[in-house]
């Protein structure tokens, strides 16, 4: 890990400890990761640290005629985050009903990349919950993701350069059907 990321991690650790003195609930249920840190954090949906857009494909069921009211758009089916943040981020978190949020938002801090499922290091929930709990939720997310149409699932995954992935994400080693990794034969669907 780079020295820059170590400083950044320590900075966020101190910031999150002050802002969140008590542990909050985080759980995965029916395709949505419910994260009680989000409403008071808004780090991931606020203005980003660069102008390069972070693409978030929308499922066909989430697309409607006035998407530009909810999101900055890269394409008719792709919302994005950049240095402007998100149009739907309000003072208490997301203003959209859960079913209208991009899958990327519904999974965060789990991140669907073209190589599998990862965990974003800077999220306060990642700092405060044990990794084994994240692995359980990640397996539940994979089990939900594979119920989507294969073409939708593949389009939802994004590509991030490997150096950035190593710096900002935890590799959960959970491949998906389209990822170049071989599925782990020991992986069993999480029984709910």
PLM regions with names:
Residues 1-192:
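Short loop/turn segments that flank or connect secondary-structure elements
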